[in-house]
Amino acid sequence: MIRSIFLGLIRFYQIVLSPLKGPRCRFLPTCSQYAYEAIERYGIWRGLFLGGKRLLRCHPFHAGGYDPVPRPSANNHPSR
C-alpha cells in the first residue's frame, strides 16, 4: 500500500508538476522515472534510497547521461 502511494506521488509529479518546470534533468531516465523504476524493482525502502542517491547526483557539477536503475544481482532480493 505504501508502495502504491509513493508510485502515485511520483506519477502526479511527472504528469502535473514536471511539465510546469520544463525539461531540466541531466540524466536518462529522468530522476523521477529512475525513482519510480527503483521502487517497482526493489520495493519502497531500497527504491527510495536509490532514488535519493540519484537526486543527490542531479546538479550542475555532474555530467549526467545514461544512468539506469541497477539490475538485481543474484545476492539482491527485492524487499516488498
UniProtKB/Swiss-Prot annotation:
- Entry's Gene Ontology cellular component terms: plasma membrane
Origin organism is Syntrophobacter fumaroxidans (strain DSM 10017 / MPOB)
**Coiled-coil regions listed in the entry:** none
Give all cystine bridges in this chain. none
Provide the taxonomic classification: Bacteria, Pseudomonadati, Thermodesulfobacteriota, Syntrophobacteria, Syntrophobacterales
Entry-linked Pfam families = YidD
Per the record, membrane topology reads: Peripheral membrane protein
List the SMART domains hit by this protein, alphabetically. Haemolytic (SM01234)
The role this protein plays is:
Could be involved in insertion of integral membrane proteins into the membrane.
Which PANTHER family did the record assign?
MEMBRANE PROTEIN INSERTION EFFICIENCY FACTOR-RELATED
Keyword Cell inner membrane listed: yes
Q: What is this protein called?
A: Putative membrane protein insertion efficiency factor
Give the principal location in a single coarse category: membrane
Which InterPro entries does the record associate with it? Membr_insert_effic_factor_YidD
**Record localization:** Cell inner membrane
For this UniProt record, the keywords arranged alphabetically read as follows: Cell inner membrane, Cell membrane, Membrane
Q: Which NCBIfam families match?
A: membrane protein insertion efficiency factor YidD
Q: Which family does the entry's similarity section mention?
A: Belongs to the UPF0161 family.
